[in-house]
């Protein structure tokens, strides 16, 4: 049997008395395009944050390729994600932000210019991200998610 790329088993997250995710289980097979849909407040972002190790589940597990995200040696080489377009330091240029991401995940620096070109930010790559519009910030976030030749 092929190991799922993503798996959640009985994943639950509560905040105080509020249950944001309630015993969620699913698998995503390699090579499949999978949507994750639901109304506001359904727990989509919370689930993604648990998969990415940003929030600890109250119970259950979420794995990437059979491993907890926190156990991945170079996670950005396996997983690309964009949860918030505004987490870039406002005084860092788009290029330097991506260089930092590449360096900390053992990704060749040449990939930085490739993804800047993919998302149409080459002409503003040396500008401070704090001056970017929402759309430009979202494209920079997407560039970060695409930085590696990702599996997920």
Predicted regions: what is each one?
Residues 39-43:
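Walker A (P-loop) phosphate-binding loop of ABC-type ATPase nucleotide-binding domains
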Residues 52:
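Helix-to-loop junction immediately C-terminal to a conserved catalytic motif
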Residues 150-152:
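Conserved small/polar residues in nucleotide/adenosyl-binding loops
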Residues 56, 60-75:
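Conserved ABC transporter NBD signature motif
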Residues 99, 103, 109-124:
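Conserved ABC ATPase "signature" region
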């Amino acid at each position: 049997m092929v190991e799922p790329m993503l798996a959640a088993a009985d994943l639950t997250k509560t905040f105080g008395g509020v249950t944001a995710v309630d015993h969620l289980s699913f698998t995503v097979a390699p090579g499949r395009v999978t949507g994750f849909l639901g109304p506001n407040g359904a727990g989509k972002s919370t689930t993604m944050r648990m998969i990415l190790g940003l929030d600890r589940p109250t119970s259950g597990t979420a794995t990437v390729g059979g491993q907890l995200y926190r156990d991945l040696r170079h996670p950005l080489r396996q997983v690309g994600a964009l949860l918030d377009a505004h987490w870039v330091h406002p005084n860092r240029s788009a290029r330097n932000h991506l260089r930092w991401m590449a360096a900390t995940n053992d990704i060749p620096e040449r990939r930085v210019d490739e993804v800047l070109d993919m998302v149409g930010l080459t002409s503003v790559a040396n500008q401070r991200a704090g001056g970017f519009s929402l759309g430009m910030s979202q494209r920079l976030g997407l560039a970060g998610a695409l930085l590696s030749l990702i599996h997920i």
